From Swiss-Prot:
GO terms for biological process: angiogenesis; apoptotic process; positive regulation of gene expression; protein folding. Belongs to the phosducin family. Its main location: cytoplasm. It is found in: Cytoplasm; Cytoplasm, Perinuclear region; Endoplasmic reticulum. Transmembrane segments: none annotated. The keyword RNA-binding does not apply. This is Phosducin-like protein 3. Residues 16-37, 217-239 are annotated as: Disordered.
Length: 239
């Protein structure tokens, strides 16, 4: 009698007709198939994980999985670096009104945009442009732009200059309008950095508002001056 499990063309025909039962899968083949499915499952898990998740779950994987895990970690790291490189700016860029939609509204998901409306001949505008150029180099992940007010917004009043608009994902998150908001020509780069950090545009390493330090120094100076004046009056009375 012919072996029903034999790999013959006739047996294959009988199996298709339902005369013979399906061929039994050897135990070793079943185990290999299960290992393959498990491996695919592990790979899919790696693909779905972020770099942080790979680090957190590293101890849960067996030694056999280390190569696959390292491969996907490197892949994720390369993708992250590529994404970071795409979002590096590092300079204060001049734009016109025609560039506004592309440079601001379509800057990219999660990109902070700082736009300075200015006009030549206004000293405070020039000072802020200097500060922004410095901050653009310090915070290359944020986009720093400048535009002559009349080319960006027709008939924009000069009394509102300088003006800073802060955007993210095409939405305005903060605005600073007019010279009084900036404190005049005494504005320092650290003060401007702090203001922008409060809006979320940059992540500052400053531990406290530099304006507060100036105010504290000013108050100390006033108190010292008042004490000196009072001591002088007391000396005059004694004479």
């Amino acid at each position: 009698m012919q072996d029903p499990n034999a790999d013959t063309e006739w047996n294959d025909i009988l199996r298709k007709k339902g005369i013979l039962p399906p061929k039994e899968t050897p135990v070793e083949e079943e185990e290999d198939e299960q290992l393959h499915l498990q491996s695919q499952s592990v790979v899919k898990t790696y693909e779905d994980m972020t770099l942080e998740e790979l680090e957190e779950n590293e101890d849960e994987f067996s030694e056999e999985d280390e190569h696959a895990m390292e491969m996907y970690r490197l892949k994720r790291l390369a993708e992250w670096k590529a994404n970071q490189m795409k979002n590096v700016f590092g300079e204060l860029k001049e734009i016109s009104g025609q560039d506004y939609v592309q440079e601001v509204n379509k800057a990219g998901e999660g990109i902070w945009v700082v736009l300075h409306l200015y006009k030549q001949g206004i000293p405070l505008c020039s000072l802020i442009n200097q500060h922004l150029a410095q901050l653009a180099r310090k915070f290359p992940q944020s986009k720093f732009l400048k535009s002559i007010s009349s080319t960006c917004i027709p008939n924009y009043p000069d009394r509102n200059l300088p003006t800073l608009f802060v955007y993210r994902d095409g939405e305005m998150k903060a605005q600073f309008i007019g010279p009084l908001v900036f404190g005049g020509m005494n504005l320092t780069c650290d003060e401007l950095e702090w203001r922008l950090s409060e809006s979320g545009a940059v992540k500052t390493d400053l531990e406290e508002n530099p304006r507060k330090q100036i105010q504290d120094q000013l108050m100390t100076s006033i108190r010292c001056s008042a004490n000196t004046h009072r001591d002088g009056e007391e000396d005059s009375d004694e004479d």
